[in-house]
Design a protein with these regions (language model features):
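Extreme N-terminal starter segment of soluble prokaryotic enzymes
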Residues: 1-3
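N-terminal Rossmann NAD(P)H-binding glycine-rich loop of SDR-like oxidoreductase domains
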Residues: 6-9, 13-17
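Rossmann-fold NAD(P) dinucleotide-binding segment
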Residues: 48, 56-75, 84
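Rossmann-fold NAD(P)-binding glycine/threonine-rich loop
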Residues: 63, 76-99, 114-118
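Conserved anion/nucleotide-ligand pocket segment
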Residues: 111-137
């Protein structure tokens, strides 16, 4: 499968590019970042886009991909209910295109969710504070 990464120079994008390059059944079709043209997705025959960009640009990226029948995986944080509603509307016109929204690919975020489920069984109330690296957008 031909997979492109948007936000390829960021922390998670860099990891995604490395994982795709290491997989025998995947081909990196494009590694795009801020300022790069999305046209490269169609020019390279991309089948799946993994988006690790920014909440302000993710919908434009998804619209381009879905309108070009490219499946999408979104790892961008800040994907709220409004964006989810927009995505559902967009996908309703493209029934053969799939989308996966997983805004927390980081191990720490996954562990935090697991810890919170466990803690909820034992505490009446608790607060969990999530922190990011210093350069997180």
């Amino acid at each position: 499968m031909k997979v492109a990464v948007l936000g390829a120079k960021g922390r998670m994008g860099t990891e995604a590019v490395a994982a795709i390059n290491a997989a025998s059944d995947l081909t990196l079709s494009a590694a795009l970042d801020l300022g790069d043209s999305l046209d490269k997705l169609t020019q390279t025959g991309t089948e799946i886009v993994v988006d690790f960009t920014h909440p302000d640009s993710v919908m434009k990226n998804l619209e381009f991909a879905i309108n070009n029948d490219i499946h999408v995986v979104v790892g961008t944080t800040g994907f709220d209910d409004k964006k989810l509603t927009q995505l559902k509307t967009l996908l309703s016109n493209h029934p053969k295109v799939g989308a996966l929204i997983a805004p927390n690919f980081g191990l720490g975020a996954v562990l935090m969710m697991q810890f919170s489920q466990t803690a909820a069984k034992y505490f009446e109330s608790a607060e969990i504070v999530e922190m990011h690296h210093a350069h997180k957008v």
